[in-house]
Design a protein with these regions (language model features):
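N-terminal membrane-anchoring alpha-helices
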Residues: 1-58
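Short, conserved clusters of charged catalytic residues that mark active-site
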Residues: 4, 46, 83, 129-133, ...
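Catalytic core of membrane glycerolipid acyltransferases/transacylases, capturing the structured
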Residues: 22, 26-42, 54, 69-127
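A short, well-structured juxtamembrane/interface segment
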Residues: 50-72
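Generic preference for hydrophobic
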Residues: 61, 75, 98, 149, ...
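Non-catalytic C-terminal accessory region of glycerolipid acyltransferases
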Residues: 131-240
């Protein structure tokens, strides 16, 4: 419980004290979005690493060599914890943005920081708005920003670490239309940090592993039609 209180206080202080910086970055983004997001992501990466340290989270990283150095990438992972996002930003060596549920856009200050670090808000109830978000993500990937999706659509709860919900196929259009590689990512044991003993935060060892990139143009057409299912099986086979 002590860790939870310290982390909550740190986040609140950060959001309040960094308001002037946030406003400057939002202003910069009107003229140079890349500069704004680069500075913003460096700040977010730093604060997320501090939070993970306070949480006692030890992160084992594998497969960094599988991340293409040039161009935008579509990262696809399982989703067990709020801490998944912290780990992704802290340790992924790419300019990165997440596709988040639209409900997150209701939180003032958090919403602005998410905008700065290239996050997009997906309204799953409105097809037209959802397609607009996917198109924005495609343009970001084409411009060199990588996008991270959790195609289960929600955090999966339960004790079976190898269990996965169905992967929704729609978001995979980002890679297809942007002609970008898909990098499957495995997040192991992240649910043990917080969700299993809410509101306590437990010091645990977790893993993040980047798998071999998938190039859709190299796959059979039938596999491309079910690319979500194909990617899901690759991740499921490696979950521990």
């Amino acid at each position: 419980m002590f860790r939870f209180i310290i982390i909550a206080m740190l986040l609140i202080l950060y959001l309040i004290l960094m308001i002037p910086v946030m406003l400057i970055l939002l202003l910069i983004s009107r003229y140079n979005n890349k500069l704004s997001s680069t500075i913003g992501q460096a700040m977010v990466r730093f604060i997320f690493k501090i939070i993970l340290f306070i949480a006692g989270t030890k992160v084992e990283i594998k497969g960094l060599e599988n991340i293409p150095k040039d161009g935008g990438v579509l990262f696809v992972s399982n989703h067990r914890s709020y801490f998944d996002i912290l780990i992704a930003y802290a340790y992924t060596p790419k300019e990165l943005g997440f596709i988040s549920k639209s409900e997150m856009s209701k939180y003032i200050l958090l919403k602005q920081w998410m905008y700065i670090v290239n996050c997009l808000f997906l309204d799953r109830k409105d097809i037209k708005k959802g397609m607009k978000t996917i198109m924005e993500a495609i343009e970001k990937v084409k411009s060199g920003t990588s996008i991270w999706i959790c195609p289960e659509g929600t955090r999966l709860k339960g004790d079976n670490q190898k269990e996965l919900l169905e992967f929704k196929e729609g978001s995979f259009k980002i890679a297809e239309k942007a002609k970008a590689p898909i990098v499957p990512v495995i997040l192991n044991n992240t649910g043990d940090i917080f969700e299993r003993q809410f509101p306590k935060i437990k010091a645990v060892k977790v893993g993040i592993e980047y798998l071999t990139p998938i190039y859709m143009e190299e796959l059979p057409k039938e596999t491309v039609k079910k690319i979500g299912e194909y990617t899901r099986e690759l991740i499921k086979d490696k979950l521990v």
